[in-house]
Amino acid sequence: MNRILSLSLLLTPILLATACARASEEAVSSPATATASAVEATAGATIDRELPLAIVHKTASCGCCGVWADHLKAAGFAVEMRDTDDMHPVKQRLGVPAGKASCHTAEIGGYVVEGHIPASDIKRLLKERPTARGLVLPGMPAGSPGMEMPDGHVQPYTVELVLADGSTQPFAQHGPGG
């Protein structure tokens, strides 16, 4: 048992690093092809027409971003993927606070959604419509959508609401004890 735990602890950083590094099958290079890709990619999923389009900005090599987009599609969102070589200007334009970045940034219903945030939290945000910039989940917590672990492990994490002034406050807790 200790051998399995040791091996899991050793391999976890490698799995996390390669999850985001693998090329996404849904990568597109321009908004024109992004729209076509969004239609094709969501053809097998049931799209909830009441939900706004999720525009996901990511680098072309990020695989976990595509897995997170699949999570959104499964929750009823139509998703448009946009690849960019430099995410910093996107995050800056959308108001992601310093130190709160992740690998992808989405625009959903007038809000910024940064990182591997569960679709249920996004739906709650859209229902409650707070005066805020959006939601952030810094880093890439193990077990969050798009970062699922083979053993089902979920690292405790907190999704934060970004207020209009750029400050944050807890919005939702996930994982053991959350």
Which ranges hold each PLM region?
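Bacterial N-terminal signal peptides that target proteins for export
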Residues: 1-8
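Local sequence-structure signature of Cys/Sec-based thiol-disulfide redox active-site neighborhoods
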Residues: 47-69, 75
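Low-complexity, Pro/Thr/Ser/Glu-rich flexible segments characteristic
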Residues: 25-49
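Stable alpha-helical elements in mature extracytoplasmic
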Residues: 61, 68, 83-86, 118-122
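Bacterial N-terminal signal peptides
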Residues: 8-17
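Thiol/selenol-based redox catalytic cores and closely related redox-interacting motifs
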Residues: 93, 100-178
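Conserved helix-turn-beta segment immediately C-terminal to the redox Cys motif
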Residues: 69-89
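Bacterial signal peptide processing site
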Residues: 20-24
